[in-house]
From Swiss-Prot:
SMART domains: RPOLD. Belongs to the RNA polymerase alpha chain family. NCBIfam families: PRK05182.1-2, PRK05182.2-5, rpoA. One of its GO terms (biological process) is DNA-templated transcription. Gene3D superfamilies: 5' to 3' exonuclease, C-terminal subdomain, DNA-directed RNA polymerase, insert domain, RNA polymerase, RBP11-like subunit. The gene is rpoA. Residues 247-335 are annotated as: Alpha C-terminal domain (alpha-CTD). It comes from Psychrobacter sp. (strain PRwf-1). HAMAP family: RNApol_bact_RpoA (MF_00059). This is DNA-directed RNA polymerase subunit alpha. InterPro entries: DNA-dir_RNA_pol_insert (IPR011262), DNA-dir_RNA_pol_RpoA/D/Rpb3 (IPR011263), DNA-dir_RpoA (IPR011773), RBP11-like (IPR036603), RNAP_asu_C (IPR011260), RNApol_insert_sf (IPR036643). GO terms for cellular component: cytoplasm; DNA-directed RNA polymerase complex.
Length: 335
């Protein structure tokens, strides 16, 4: 397979091997050398930190003032109960915040299925054990669930007056629906090329999103973030404004103003030399080739030019000037 040096090989095969509803292995190939790690690292970071999800950020437990309290009839410490609440896998539809309640009497095991849910909220792991109640145990609590991204420590969360109330226990929140991501890059071969990459991504979700959808969302986020570079337009530097070059006014005067002899003046006009600027650009050799113009006339011309600080065989930039009309030149022919 021969490619132009400027062309890049693009992946033409993607395989999603679903181990179960929450685990999958995604294989992408072939990739140019180095792109396996480039894409793998970027997708891994996005999967772990940028996908939206729901998590419990606050709990109010009846009879509990702080997380170091104990609740009569509950076998676990309050800290253990809060830790178990972090394992809830919650999906919310068309809502960013919701309050859930749990009211259960012992004896028995407390699971996520005991939480009362509104119609637009689901818990995908209802079998999750939250705690155990004894014969006289009674657990009544209210949970605050919000949508977010990544990991949010409780101590960095902005609080208002209500959330600072005694008895409102704050939890660190892990919003990401992806719990584990690992990738590896293997060698791949296409025809005679053996320097290619094969990217393998293994991921596990909490069940609120299937692995294939998680990969799709991560790739979409990456595409949206870098698409701005595709349309990046280089800002063209403004062209420098050229200052109008000033021409010595003497050069714009007609050769008649040199007050040469009639013979010399007529010889110059015969060669279409009408302005002093035309004259100073001629060399002695060129002028001596002019019919009827001898060395005496040449000496006269050189002396007159010297009296004005000029000489023959000068090099003038941008001559004739743009504002010197062609009509002006020909107007002297009739003189």
């Amino acid at each position: 397979m021969m490619l132009n040096a400027t062309e890049f090989l693009t992946p033409n095969a993607i395989n999603v091997d679903a181990v179960d509803e929450t685990n999958a292995k995604v294989t992408l190939e072939p990739l140019e050398r180095g792109f396996g790690h480039t894409l793998g690292n970027a997708l891994r970071r996005i999967l772990l930190s940028s996908l939206p999800g729901a998590a419990v950020i606050e709990a109010e437990i009846e009879g509990v003032d702080h997380e170091y309290s104990t609740l009569e009839g509950l076998q676990e410490d309050v800290l253990d109960l809060l830790l178990n609440l972090k394992g809830l896998a919650i999906t919310m539809h068309d809502q960013n915040e919701v309050f859930l309640t749990l009211d259960k009497k012992g004896p028995g095991i407390i699971t996520a299925a005991d939480i009362e849910l509104p119609h637009n909220v689901d818990i995908v792991n209802p079998e999750l054990v939250l705690g155990t109640l004894g014969d006289r145990g009674h657990l009544k609590m209210r949970l605050r669930v919000v949508m977010g991204r990544g990991y949010e420590p409780a101590n960095l969360r902005r609080e208002d007056g209500d959330t600072k109330a005694i008895g409102r226990l704050k939890l660190d929140a892990s919003f990401s629906p992806v719990s584990r991501v690992a990738y590896q890059v293997e060698n791949a071969r296409v025809e005679q090329r053996t320097d290619l990459d094969r990217l393998i991504i293994e991921l596990e979700t909490n069940g609120t999103i299937d692995p294939e959808e998680a990969i799709r969302k991560a790739a979409t986020i990456l595409q949206q973030q870098i698409s701005i570079f595709v349309d990046l337009e280089a800002e063209e530097a403004p062209e420098p404004v050229k200052e109008k070059e000033e021409v010595d006014p003497v050069l714009l005067r007609p050769v008649d103003d040199l007050e040469l002899t009639v013979r010399s003046a007529n010889c110059l006009k015969a060669e279409n030399i009408y302005y002093i600027g035309d004259l100073v650009q001629r060399s002695e050799t060129e002028l001596l080739k002019t019919p009827n113009l001898g060395k005496k006339s040449l000496t006269e011309i050189k002396d007159v030019l010297a009296s004005k600080g000029l000489e023959l065989d000068m090099r003038l930039e941008n001559w004739p000037p743009a504002d010197l009309r062609v009509d002006d030149r020909f107007s002297y022919r009739s003189r």
